[in-house]
Amino acid sequence: MPATDVGRRINHLVSSLQKDRTKIIIPTPALAEVLTRAERAGADYFTKLNRSAAFRIEPFETRAAIELARMTAMAIASGDKREGLSATWNEIKFDRQIVAIAKVTKVSTIYSDDENLGKLAKVQGFNVTTIRELPLPSEDAQMTFAWDVLHEEQEADDE
């Protein structure tokens, strides 16, 4: 089931992390995906992310390459370089780059709706949260609750 209220959920996450003074790490492979999907708005997104104190763009560099090699070697040694994933080998290598960057930058949680990325991240000990699992701001949650209650009352009246 796709997430609803995606923008509000993400904005609430960013606000919450900013209040806690937690940097939001964006691995460059993930940034490339976002910018590709954003098309014309990509340049504006990049400028905002790059200028914001809340975000830190992290490149795939030497430490991440070493971590990626370690992760891949362990998967190969286990007899399944794909670790049971149905993704293409290129997709798996791409997702492992993201996980390797997260690992060397000491990230605790990965936020993603990508099922394969989530599985790889969990194997490496990360908490994984999907957009659907992100809470709405409290006022939105209250409004949703009120709407649900009103809707249930209306259904009861109709019976």
Feature map (PLM): residue ranges:
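Short, well-structured N-terminal submotif of metal-dependent ribonuclease cores
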Residues: 1-26, 35-52, 139-159
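Acidic, PIN/NYN-like endoribonuclease modules and their adjacent C-terminal/linker elements
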Residues: 2, 99-159
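Short active-site oxyanion
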Residues: 20-24, 54-56, 105-109
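Short beta-strand scaffold positions
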Residues: 26, 59, 93, 111-112
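Short basic/aromatic active-site micro-motif
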Residues: 29, 88-96
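Alpha-helix capping/helix-boundary segments
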Residues: 30, 64, 97-98, 116-117
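Short catalytic/ligand-binding loop motif for oxyanion handling, primarily in non-cytosolic enzymes
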Residues: 32-37, 118-121
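Acidic catalytic patch
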Residues: 55-88
